[in-house]
């Protein structure tokens, strides 16, 4: 049986940063394993498994907020208690082993999955974008996503393509002012659309109508949005950041981090070269098809059984 027990995360995190108490056992009764699916492994007398999605707080502390900066210390404490680690990519697995000195036999990579969304309406996407041709970026606006570089790339691209627009859809996270400043300084700001958070219907519509999908991140432990775009048949340009080469494979065009010129060139090739675009769409669909949530769930279930068996 699985018990999903929501708790007051922040107060407990503050305590678990400093001590291995209180034990989570007091709230959930008898159990074989506790799984913390988002960096935090609650202390327990049973076996522990924690999911580590990335090491932003270690590699790029300037790109992490105060809450996530606490994660490395909590990971170390859990490892000292004997916790197992699930990572969402082989890249992060290697990082966890190297940075924390974790036992390789107790750090297991299981990729995330993607479910194909119902087809969106391109006409709805065009209405949201204010035009039929647009480059799309989806997700929370925060420094790690490096959207100002995308704005600079679009400035170059828009000079060569007068009909193209840039659409950024996602809620403002911390540090979102940098994107606002980049848009305000852009000579192409009239063709840049910021939509804020969108619901699933509008997300699907935006993907259905997009000429290209851009993912210019500085660092990623997995990178689900480009896989979702590939699954929807949208050609993707991403950066060679963190796990993205592993996850995207040959299903995306990859460019160096922070290189607006290279990003603009890759996007231009997609919107200008129909043959390349079609080839990239087909490769992207093949890559995305490998990320199946049912397979992920089976592998995680096997891992939980394995972890539970380590405590008598």
Model-predicted segments: where are they?
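Carbohydrate transferase catalytic cores enriched for Leloir-type hexosyltransferases
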Residues: 1-312
